[in-house]
Amino acid sequence: MERRIFVDAAPLELSPREFAVLELLMLRQGRVVSKVQLQEHLASFGHAIGEASHDVVGDTAIEVYVHRVRRKIEHSEAEIVTVRGFGYLLQARAPV
């Protein structure tokens, strides 16, 4: 199954793990997603695409994936906000 995300009608180029991070944030848009929830989602997503089930994604790797996704959606109407001590939140970008 092919999964795609579009920004302004253009497909967003994401690695499988970047896709998984953005997917979970989109599914829970407006709610804080913890690093543990992201780790669990990445593990189940990895299993679905054939990665070894023992692969654990650490906090630093999650921070890197979130940073990469932030850069890739920086021109969209959404932004990923860090909620210090809790996790991440996908929300509509505030008007400038």
Regions picked out by a protein language model, each given a short descriptive name:
Residues 5, 45-49:
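Alpha-helix C-capping/helix-to-loop hinge sites
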Residues 49-52, 94-96:
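Short, low-complexity, intrinsically disordered N-terminal peptides in bacterial proteins
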Residues 33-34, 50-51, 81:
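Short linear functional motifs in flexible/disordered or boundary regions
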Residues 10-46, 67-69:
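Short amphipathic alpha-helical recognition elements used for nucleic-acid or partner binding
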Residues 13-23, 51-74, 84-88:
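DNA-recognition element of transcription regulators
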